[in-house]
Amino acid sequence: MRYLTAGESHGPQLTTIIEGVPAGLYITEEDINFELARRQKGHGRGRRMQIEKDQAKIMSGVRHARTLGSPIALVVENNDWKHWTKIMGAAPITEDEEKEMKRQISRPRPGHADLNGAIKYNHRDMRNVLERSSARETTVRVAAGAVAKKILSELGIKVAGHVLQIGAVKAEKTEYTSIEDLQRVTEESPVRCYDEEAGKKMMAAIDEAKANGDSIGGIVEVIVEGMPVGVGSYVHYDRKLDSKLAAAVLSINAFKGVEFGIGFEAAGRNGSEVHDEIIWDEEKGYTRATNRLGGLEGGMTTGMPIVVRGVMKPIPTLYKPLKSVDIETKEPFSASIERSDSCAVPAASVVAEAAVAWEIANAVVEQFGLDQIDRIRENVENMRKLSREF
């Protein structure tokens, strides 16, 4: 499977075309819109979330709530477009009209794609860069992830994302009774944190950063349960599942690091304290005594829960902007201020969930069949049976 996204932050709409989704999958616009609503929540979001009430429209590839096997086109309209029709329109404009535009940007913001993108594509107006590099694009990535999650749910595979840390505040209570319990608690938390007390401190940290004109980052975790053994490959570097998952997480705006299981903590431990002992269970078959490696060994799933974490840097758009240089005058200047969040970590956990779900679904569909969801389900069950009887 693959998908492409198109659209600018203040353009008329965002679009994604998804190819390779198996036929027969039950999906509705409500399924997708549920995920889009989750992305828009979270303490620390900016005023843009009050303007946009994202609703996806299925334009092709689905008939009577069943996928056809043909490309699926999804569209999300931007409500704010009506205020940007002249500035962001596709029609040509005169030189006088271009000069009159007050929203041309020649002052790159530190930490953004503005300057590098402007140099790469020779844009004197850096709005041409920031409109596409905006995290607004993750809207349709979450929409694609919603389709992936529907595929996984058909196969008994569950995905949940939550927040482990915001700023210096870390969740202490992280042991959940079930993935459903984790989902239930985090959906009720304004910061998507399982630890209620830590969640309150996280909100206070966000409020403090906002009051200071600053921003704040954090760490999110995604759990995947119900995976059959052997998804991925040890044969080639580019087929290793952890490699693909790492790339997916790091492709999310502002993410700067990724780890699996105990992750970087493994550097300070002996091997006996890192690797997971193999045990035999009459009901489950081969399993592990621990899950320090996060459900992945040799680029393949072990059958244990996949545990992947990503670190998100603080959003670089600040209300007390850092110094920059005007590309026209070459004079130092305080960077321009665009409407932004003070903290997007809670929303980022939803985006990370979607990104991980997509890579997992893609790997499963590729390995167990491409065309029909019923055939894929049958093949997955056969693999589960094989691993129990091996």
From Swiss-Prot:
Its cofactor is FMNH2. Its EC number is 4.2.3.5. Keywords: Amino-acid biosynthesis, Aromatic amino acid biosynthesis, FAD, Flavoprotein, FMN, Lyase, NADP. FMN binds at R132, S133, S134, N253, A254, G298, K313, P314, I315, P316, T317, R339. The keyword NADP applies. InterPro entries: Chorismate_synth (IPR000453), Chorismate_synth_AroC_sf (IPR035904), Chorismate_synthase_CS (IPR020541). Belongs to the chorismate synthase family. This is Chorismate synthase. It comes from Bacillus subtilis (strain 168).
